[in-house]
Amino acid sequence: MYKIIIDSCGELTDTLKKDGHFCNVALELDVDGYRIRDDESFDQHDFLRRVKESVKGPKSSCPSPEEYMQAFEGEADHVYVVTLSGKLSGSYNSAVLAVNLYNEEHEDSDKKIYVFNSRSASIGETLIGMKVQELEETGLSFDEVVKQTEEYIASMNTFFVLE
């Protein structure tokens, strides 16, 4: 059994949310001291209004190691984490720290956990998660899924258009 954890910068479709293999760990946004979780309760209109009225502009914070560790729990023996680019956020470092802490606390566990630095954002993270799912469904070993997914990430290019 496997689980794919994607930070909330990734775009999970309704189908992926219902799949059972995918879950999100939320980033947080701060607008003048008002904290907003980037989860299903996120109100984009309220957020944009607050940003427009803000003197300083918004800040974001990555999920804590504890939030990642909670997401590791469950029956899955293969856990894959896909994070926002390590050059854009601390999400990758937080997830790696969470793996180290989790492994210290669960020394006897057979659970295998790997963190992918997407080197991307948004749909790039989602595509990586979908690649992991495709590879897992073919019955590949954990190590082979990691290897092929890292090769996939190395071949990706992400482009953004700002309006």
Spans of model-derived segments:
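Short Gly/Thr/Asp-enriched flexible loops that form oxyanion-binding sites at enzyme active sites
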Residues: L84-H106, L127-G129
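Short glycine-rich or small-residue beta-strand-to-loop segments that form or flank ligand, phosphate
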Residues: H78-G86, Y114-N117, K131
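Acidic/polar active-site rim loop that often engages polyanionic ligands
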Residues: D108-K111, E125-E134
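Conserved active-site and cofactor/substrate-binding residues in soluble primary-metabolism enzymes
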Residues: F42, D46, P63-E67, G90-N93, ...
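Short, acidic/small-residue loops that bind anionic groups at enzyme active sites
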Residues: V99-S122, S141-F142, V146
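N-terminal glycine-rich anion-binding loop in soluble enzyme alpha/beta folds
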Residues: K3-E67
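Internal, active-site/partner-interface "lid" segment
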Residues: Q133-E163
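Glycine-rich phosphate/diphosphate-binding loops that line cofactor/substrate pockets in enzymes
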Residues: M69-V79
